[in-house]
A protein has these predicted regions:
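ABC-type ATPase nucleotide-binding domains, specifically the catalytic core motifs of the NBD
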Residues: 15-17, 108-121, 130
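Helix-to-loop junction immediately C-terminal to a conserved catalytic motif
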Residues: 55
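Conserved ABC transporter NBD signature motif
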Residues: 63-71
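Conserved ABC ATPase "signature" region
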Residues: 71, 119-136
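ABC ATPase NBD coupling module
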Residues: 72-89
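Conserved ABC ATPase signature
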Residues: 140-144
Length: 244
């Protein structure tokens, strides 16, 4: 099966005055439909930059990023915008701009114009149910726990029915049980809906339910060790630490 997302020898640099800061170095990575790929790395390893380049928000300095055979770095701004509205979902836990919105309204916002409020909110309730957050449909963002905010943010991305989901550190500030709940839900969403998921996390335990594990260190992906699905794995990470 052809990959949904393909990164080929991708590098990304920024200029800091006269100096060049290399954040990604020759990164090659595939994400196929129906799989969750988790990238582990310490702070500053380049995880967020990797996701932003993979999403087409930032162009690579060199290399190629393709989504379903579309070269994102060469696609027009309007073509990328259409993909972001429909096929490529981005999860961020920023919450609604208006604190007056309840969560079914917030999750429905991306569909209001195309589907109308009533149908949009029905789709929103389905998305909230998919992530196990239907109980907070009538709650406001300020009243949610960290776990509930994470689940609502994922639902807001899923309501568009994307084919690719990019998730930056969904386990931040969560306990172990909630980390496994969130990553397990993402794994199930990938398998049940044929969704490709690329997730960046700083903690090894959050990745145990991923289909593929990748370690990122100083902008480079290390030699992968993939576990059997549903089982943990022991992986050597930078610094000689072992996690299981």
């Amino acid at each position: 099966m052809a990959p949904l997302l393909h990164l080929d020898a991708v590098s990304k640099s920024y200029m800091r005055g006269p100096r060049e800061l290399r954040v990604l170095r020759d990164v090659s990575l595939d994400v196929h439909p129906g799989e969750l790929v988790a990238v582990y790395g310490k702070r500053g390893a380049g995880k967020t930059t990797l996701l932003r380049v993979a999403a087409g928000f930032e162009p690579p300095t060199s290399g190629v990023v393709t989504f379903d055979d579309v070269d994102l770095s060469r696609a027009s701004r309007s073509r990328r915008a259409r993909l972001h509205r429909s096929d490529i979902g981005w999860v961020e836990r920023a919450g609604p701009r208006s604190q007056e919105l309840v969560m079914r309204e917030y999750v429905a916002l991306p569909l209001y114009r195309s589907a109308g409020p009533s149908k949009a909110e029905r789709h929103a309730m389905n998305a909230l149910a998919k992530v196990g957050a239907e109980d907070v449909a009538d709650a406001r963002w300020t009243n949610l726990s960290d776990t509930e905010r994470t689940l609502v943010a994922i639902a807001e991305a899923l309501v568009r029915e994307p084919r690719l989901l990019l998730v930056d550190d969904p386990t931040a500030m969560l306990g172990m049980a909630d980390r496994e709940r969130v990553t397990g839900m993402l794994c199930s969403a990938a398998e049940d809906d044929g969704l490709g998921v690329l997730m960046a996390v700083p903690e090894m335990p959050a990745m145990l339910q991923a289909h593929k594990l990748r370690a990122l260190s100083r902008g480079r992906l290390l030699v992968p060790t993939d576990p059997p699905h549903g089982h943990g794995a022991v992986i050597e990470f930078p610094g000689g630490e072992r996690s299981a």
